[in-house]
């Protein structure tokens, strides 16, 4: 099979493809074998009707049309690989002549391809990097958090509720305008007052109440409340505080260190906490630096981001989010309902991030091309083994599946991008961060990839390819 490429305007190319006679015959024979099993021909057992009888029974044109519909996607995919192009949308297929088992078959495919970013300066850039510093206050805060995990709850009888207390209460709410309020009722509910688990005004009304006291008060739901039907609604709550409890914190001493950790003394525990905080701070600073390096390179590059790529990326981000929500046992449609939004609205919200991500991916692709970067075979094997472990299949099965659905190339592409980002970071010059930026929280996000991101993108791309194949078959 041969495929010639002609560049067109607007990032499009035309593939002129010639399918040899033997490939056409293979496609027709494959379809005939399938039809023999499906079609009942009087006088013949299923699967035994000869070709001439099937042609008489169904018509040669029908058989050729079915064979073409079955074979064309594979021929197009083969041509894309042979021509070394990277389509980003569905092709427009055109042909003049029908299948011919003696002459072969010719068709053209016009398709939009991935644009190439024009890199500006990308090596030796000066990029601010945050200094890693852990204060004594941070160590003490972490120590207090650990101390809180070993606290016990002691009953309070000689004072009313105050912030930080735990209360056990019954409550029931009903609309001030009349009518029940589903879900606004509980018995023996334990609440940490002031933590923000329930409405702020609800928790504030508990402060000052005593054990055994009953009270009713009105609360108005804020206009940005997650449940749209409750926004701005006034609700009357009847509350019965049954018990008040307060934290009884253990003393900070060597005995606590032994109970809470593998260390013998409090000072050893403090040192370990500092080391953990410093390591976490280093990771955040490195992640932020990598993001800043990529941002600096992207700012100096020129690239037009196609709308179809933004749409695909936004869909990928939504699907990744929905997988994450589902993994927590929450149905995506339930999440959208509770959050007062919908899937399409959520997709609109992530479009700017999607466009930014696509631009940076195109920039990394340009670095890959400029520096001749390739994915490491060891890294490819590692990702395939990781995917196999998650799916309960063998690495060989996973690799075969990735190659068949066209996402093996995507895996290598994503790993090459990560390697390109490593290259950019290695060739950047870290400079002290300006004081005004030091006050901003750092980002530990791995730009362009990271643990789990490759797998998510491969899965999402496989789903998208499957949907496109289905749509192609239906046309």
From Swiss-Prot:
One of its GO terms (molecular function) is protein folding chaperone. PROSITE patterns: FKBP_PPIASE (PS50059). Keywords: Cell cycle, Cell division, Chaperone, Cytoplasm, Isomerase, Rotamase. Residues 164-250 form the PPIase FKBP-type domain. GO terms for biological process: 'de novo' cotranslational protein folding; cell division; chaperone-mediated protein folding; protein transport; protein unfolding. Residues 428-475 are annotated as: Disordered. One of its GO terms (cellular component) is cytoplasm. It is found in: Cytoplasm. Pfam families: FKBP_C (PF00254), Trigger_C (PF05698), Trigger_N (PF05697). Its main location: cytoplasm. Residues 462-475 have a biased composition (Acidic residues). InterPro entries: PPIase_dom_sf (IPR046357), PPIase_FKBP_dom (IPR001179), Trig_fac (IPR005215), Trigger_fac_C (IPR008880), Trigger_fac_C_sf (IPR037041), Trigger_fac_ribosome-bd_bac (IPR008881), Trigger_fac_ribosome-bd_sf (IPR036611), Trigger_fact/SurA_dom_sf (IPR027304). Its EC number is 5.2.1.8. Consists of 3 domains; the N-terminus binds the ribosome, the middle domain has PPIase activity, while the C-terminus has intrinsic chaperone activity on its own. Involved in protein export. Acts as a chaperone by maintaining the newly synthesized protein in an open conformation. Functions as a peptidyl-prolyl cis-trans isomerase. Belongs to the FKBP-type PPIase family. Tig subfamily. This is Trigger factor.
